[in-house]
UniProtKB/Swiss-Prot annotation:
Protein name as it appears in the record: Indole-3-glycerol phosphate synthase
Keyword line: Amino-acid biosynthesis, Aromatic amino acid biosynthesis, Decarboxylase, Lyase, Tryptophan biosynthesis
Enzyme Commission number, as recorded: 4.1.1.48
GO biological process: L-tryptophan biosynthetic process
PANTHER family registered for this protein in UniProt: INDOLE-3-GLYCEROL-PHOSPHATE SYNTHASE, TRYPTOPHAN BIOSYNTHESIS PROTEIN
InterPro entries tied to this protein: Aldolase_TIM (IPR013785), Indole-3-glycerol_P_synth (IPR045186), Indole-3-glycerol_P_synth_dom (IPR013798), Indole-3-GlycerolPSynthase_CS (IPR001468), RibuloseP-bd_barrel (IPR011060)
Native organism: Burkholderia vietnamiensis (strain G4 / LMG 22486)
Pathway the protein contributes to: Amino-acid biosynthesis; L-tryptophan biosynthesis; L-tryptophan from chorismate: step 4/5
Enzyme class, first EC level, given as a word: lyase
Cysteines joined through disulfide linkages: none
Length: 261
């Protein structure tokens, strides 16, 4: 498979340029200031303090590697189902071209429940972070594979200045070193290689020795069964970002409950 990540990043840069022409920074700042914030990190910590897994449940229609995951896709219904069945937070795909996501999906999901929401997208510019705040996101994702360290630090500082939480995502040990220069307590280990889309949960287990005690590991991708959850919890990984396994189920929230509770 060709290098998907490079293609996505190129598209994102074009999208940012177009968005800046259509919605000037000052207009976006006005929208952002009108939005309330929910405590993303606090919601995860509360689950862990109660001895429960902290699940970031994903609202995702499709992916480049798997195609359409869910034909009947109603973000508000999915969000309510997740909230009812014990999710700590939501993750909503807003990328249109590769994941068939939408800003509207994030707005609808957030309005349907009280859970904090992560904007799941490929952030390459501070403008997208202000966009995230304006659409109602409570957290953003920074992907180490897509950013150099100085830019990642700059984007994190801007997100924090807006009150947004940051989940930094890594896939290998070099990226982990990069991520640990940030201030965020949330370190996502993506079991899927974004350059090949190959997936193994061993990726998380192999990097745990690098993570300081003051960081929370979120294992991402490839968590498909109760056995996968048990493997992670036995290794003291208690925060999860899961999408595909729930999206393929008749009722996403019930699938979450079966897998985690």
């Amino acid at each position: 498979m060709s290098d998907i990540l490079d293609r996505i990043i190129a598209v994102k840069r074009d999208e940012v340029a177009a968005a800046m022409r259509s919605t000037p920074l000052e207009a976006l700042k006005l929208e952002a200031s009108a939005r309330d914030l929910r405590d993303f990190v606090g919601a995860l910590r509360a689950k862990q303090a109660a001895g429960q897994p902290a699940v970031i449940a994903e609202v995702k229609k499709a992916s480049p590697s798997k195609g359409v995951l869910r034909e009947h896709f109603v973000p508000a219904d999915i969000a309510r189902s997740y909230a009812t069945h014990g999710a700590a937070c939501l993750s909503v795909l807003t990328d249109e071209q590769f994941f068939q996501g939408s800003v509207r999906y994030l707005e609808e999901a957030r309005a349907a429940c009280t859970l904090p929401v992560l904007r799941k997208d490929f952030i390459v510019d501070a403008y997208q972070i202000l966009e995230a705040r304006a659409m109602g996101a409570d957290a953003i994702l920074l992907i180490a594979a897509a950013l150099d360290t100085p830019l990642m630090q700059e984007l994190e500082a801007y997100a924090h200045s807006l009150g947004l939480a940051v989940l930094v995502e890594v896939h290998d040990r070099n990226e982990m070193e990069q991520a640990l220069t940030l201030k965020t307590p949330l370190v996502g280990i993506n079991n899927r290689n974004l350059r090949t889309f190959e997936t193994t949960i061993q990726t998380t287990l192999d990097m745990l020795d690098m993570v300081p005690a003051d960081r929370m590991v979120v294992t991402e991708s490839g968590i498909l069964s109760r056995a996968d959850v048990d493997t992670m919890r036995a290794a003291n990984v208690n925060a999860f970002l899961v999408g595909e396994a729930f999206m393929r189920a008749d009722e996403p929230g019930a699938a979450l409950a079966r897998m985690f509770f």
